[in-house]
Amino acid sequence: MFYSSAYIIRIGVIAILPALPGYAQHAQPVEQRIFQAINQVRQENKLPPLKWHAKIAEVAQSHSRRMATKRFFSHEDPQFGGPDNRLSAAGVAWRLCGENIFEEYGEADPVRSAVRGWMQSSGHRKNILTRGFTHTGIGLARGRDGSYTITQMFAAF
């Protein structure tokens, strides 16, 4: 689903390839690798790569952190609402937005399982392959139990 909106899953393989155009130098290593893998999937489907958006990444990071610390797993934050509300509150003037979320326990490297899981879920796959999305940001949080919580947000302006 996506907003004009999007929503979705706890899932969890795709090859991690060299950096693609549009990578933000401020992304962390896992987020960077997810970004690269998602753009590789888009390239394989003859879609343009997504561009990194630092403000969207901040919103995604905040959502992952809140899910990990407040122990909920949802596109709807009990305090800050859905991705549309969270992006707007951060000053992101989106025209179209979407979100994929992922949570995993016990995996040393969540990149492959996150991307594979998203691609095997119709709603997540739709977000990744929506031609209208032009920008993305990804945020990851580690739980005290070692779990990974990942949020990828998409937008078009």
Question: For each predicted feature, which ranges?
Answer:
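N-terminal secretory signal peptides that target proteins for export/translocation
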Residues: 1-6
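Bacterial N-terminal signal peptides
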Residues: 10-19
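Hydrophobic alpha-helical segments, especially transmembrane helices
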Residues: 11, 43, 64, 125-126
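Sec/Tat signal peptide C-region and signal peptidase I cleavage site
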Residues: 20-24
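Short, well-ordered surface patches within globular domains
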Residues: 25-87, 131, 135-136, 143
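A well-ordered secondary-structure block
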Residues: 83-157
